[in-house]
Amino acid sequence: MRHAQVRVPTAPRGLMLAVLASMVLASSAPVSHASFEELEPSVVCSTIDELQFNGTHANASISWQVGLGPRIPGSNASAEFRATITADLESLGYEVSNKTHERYGMELTNLFARWPSDSTSNGQLVLSAHYDSRNVADQDENESNQSLPVPGANDAASGVAVLLELARHIPHMNLDYDVVLFFNDAEDQQPKYTLGAEAWAENLTGDEINTTHAFVLLDMVGDADLQLHDIAPGNATLKSRVVELGTSLGLVNGTTSCNGEAGLDVLQYETTVYVLDDHVHAHNLGIPAIDLMDTSFGVPKPYTFGSYWHTMEDTPDKVSAQSLAKVGRLVELGLRTDAFVNINPSSDTTGEEDTSSVEQPEEGESEAYPNQNTGLAVMASVGLVSILGLLVVVEVRGKR
């Protein structure tokens, strides 16, 4: 699957979003969070003191993962990664299993670590990150590097690092539902994408779908300049709760944290970015899903997710323990306050149901990039998603 993003930012001065149709694409606007059930602020604030996530400990995992070498499906590094975390997670009491699939001539292996709950009837929450690193650095400015495998410190290891650190603390949270840590494979192998998550979704039973509270994806969450955008498609209630949690932790600009501190500009949910990522497969099954992702890794660069993305510059020094801590504490707070369970699937943002079927531009086709300074806008045709013929001025970037 080709990854792509269609970003609809809050319009800068001079930039007009033109709609040339008789109907408005509801999902093109930032999600409104006001109409959804809110968390109890006093409960959230009192829970912050219980948080145990250690960003420094998580960051140590980044160097270890990259040190294994390219974690390409079927490689020795991939197998060593699974063997090591299997031993570590089993020592903590997790039930660990692997499932191998054959896709497009590629053997991929998904790894699952389940923490059994105190109850057997309250369903499961899936926390996921891809552990494979990209097989080619095709966005590297140095042409001699473009055939080399990417180190994958941020785009691979960062999400895994957060899950592994959370794994240390989940057994002590006394949750009344199961937590499944899903380390998915073959998310980022040129020319195919999200194959591990796709295989997982295709093999779920109806009962497993119905008893899954939510699917929370962590992707590219270690950038020192952390900027988490509203990723579409996704569940609006989950997004609303993430903003509430982030506000309490001081991650939302213009707000005040539970500690009375001014919020940082980390959760930027006024900007919606369309990304065909692993979470789409859960979303399309009706499982409430959210993608926690930084879509700007390094210096902004047209048609990409930043100057370090899919290059040999995706190295451990670009990843910040502080950023990992911000994301890890956000997810931990959500776990401890039950923010990710008992979500209404019908609250998915209108118009996002079939985002994965939008035709993406083939490599080599021309794309325009809106310059924020000049207000240049791009007219992109959005087809096959129940709004045939609707044209919206948007920014189009391909994740290739």
Annotate the PLM regions:
Residues 214, 224-362:
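Active-site-adjacent substrate-binding region
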Residues 57-67, 76, 80-91, 96, ...:
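Extracytoplasmic/secreted proteins, especially bacterial periplasmic and envelope-associated proteins
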Residues 1-46, 349-400:
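Secretory targeting signatures
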Residues 71-73, 102-105, 118-120, 131-135, ...:
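Solvent-exposed loop/turn segments at secondary-structure junctions
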Residues 147-243:
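Acidic/histidine-rich catalytic neighborhood of metal-dependent amide-processing enzymes
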Residues 36-82, 92, 301-318:
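N-terminal capping segment at the start of a domain
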